[in-house]
């Protein structure tokens, strides 16, 4: 739902109500057959998960159902408190096909050679992959208990030394 009473296009001056219904455009008062229903803003499915907003232009599956399953696994994490820390953030600009990037994210054979810090934490010989209809989950286990999540007793992963959950949602969203 829009928080403003009006939506105004700064480029054309078109004005819409808070539901996206066309109201006005400068210099078009006398135009025949204007406005039409097609001049209203389109309605797109919107889903908010913590501080992330997802819009489906033509969704073929329910993102809400996908995140319900993800929440079953990681709801114990205080995701609502996450804030960007620029000191811990790294940006990489790469010239690669998106599918190749996804493939790189999903295969872990390169970790010992490319991600030295991560390789010190993860037990390379202990790794699980779970496949769902629209996402997969890779679970990285820690070499020692100091590097793992504090998992609640009633959780399916309680007692496991899990250092990372790597989610890949079809076609190109990665969460870890």
What do these predicted ranges mean?
Residues 1-58:
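Rieske [2Fe-2S] iron-sulfur-binding domain
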Residues 45-48, 52-176:
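C-terminal catalytic domain of Rieske-type non-heme iron oxygenases
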């Amino acid at each position: 739902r829009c928080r403003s009473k009006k939506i105004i296009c700064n480029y054309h001056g078109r004005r819409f109500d808070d539901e996206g219904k066309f109201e006005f455009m400068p210099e078009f008062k006398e135009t025949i057959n204007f406005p039409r229903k097609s001049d209203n803003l389109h309605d797109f499915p919107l889903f908010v998960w913590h501080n992330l907003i997802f819009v489906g232009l033509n969704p073929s599956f329910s993102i809400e159902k996908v995140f319900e399953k993800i929440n079953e696994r990681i709801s114990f994490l205080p995701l609502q408190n996450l804030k960007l820390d620029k000191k811990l953030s790294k940006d990489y600009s790469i010239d690669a096909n998106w599918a190749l990037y996804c493939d790189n994210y999903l295969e872990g054979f390169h970790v010992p050679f490319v991600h030295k810090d991560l390789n010190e934490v993860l037990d390379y010989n202990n790794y699980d992959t779970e496949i769902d209809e629209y996402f997969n989950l890779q679970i990285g286990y820690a070499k020692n208990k100091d590097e793992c999540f504090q998992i609640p007793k009633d959780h399916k992963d309680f007692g496991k030394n899990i250092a990372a959950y790597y989610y890949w949602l079809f076609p190109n969203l990665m969460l870890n």
